[in-house]
A protein has these predicted regions:
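Divalent-cation
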Residues: 1-155
Length: 155
């Protein structure tokens, strides 16, 4: 099962692992690699529709986990109205984190996770120094990835 790892940009730099579907993993990967399909795929279509209807994705927020399922929100702002400061969304739409991330990487929107969620489900990132055996750390990480299950992140 594919997994996306979100990392805190500063501070403790914990990792938030989220299991996702193969189709969403492919959508995220192709967008990060800058590959463009000959015809718009689902998340490309979502980005096009936002633009056509005068909206933009201000940010996504991974909000919670319930029964081993993560939840996210799209924070949309109207781009064709005066006075929109972008701080308060005009619309908040609940969605799967994988879809939110796939859309965010396409349009360059920031990705956030609720602090209490990171406190609950975040994993400490290994700090690698020059003295550490990088191969051993990589092997440990591979073992973690191969054996991880949704139950490992249950509250």
């Amino acid at each position: 099962t594919p997994m996306v790892l979100l990392r805190e940009p500063e501070g403790r730099r914990r990792l938030l692992p989220i299991l996702i579907g193969t189709a969403e993993a492919t959508a995220i990967h192709t967008s990060l690699e800058g590959l463009e399909p000959p015809r718009p795929l689902t998340h490309d279509l979502m980005a096009i529709l936002l633009g056509e209807f005068g909206a933009s994705l201000a940010r996504i927020v991974i909000t919670e986990v319930r029964d081993h399922t993560f939840y996210a929100e799209l924070h949309l702002v109207a781009t064709d109205t005066d006075g929109a400061d972008g701080d308060e969304p005009d619309h908040v739409i609940s969605c799967r984190p994988s879809d939110a991330i796939a859309l965010a990487v396409r349009v360059g929107a920031p990705i956030f996770a609720a602090e209490d969620l990171v406190d609950e489900c975040g994993q400490e990132a290994a700090v690698v120094s020059d003295d550490d055996d990088a191969e051993e750390i990589i092997d440990e990480f591979r073992d973690f990835i191969e054996n991880v299950s949704p139950e490992d992140f249950a509250p």
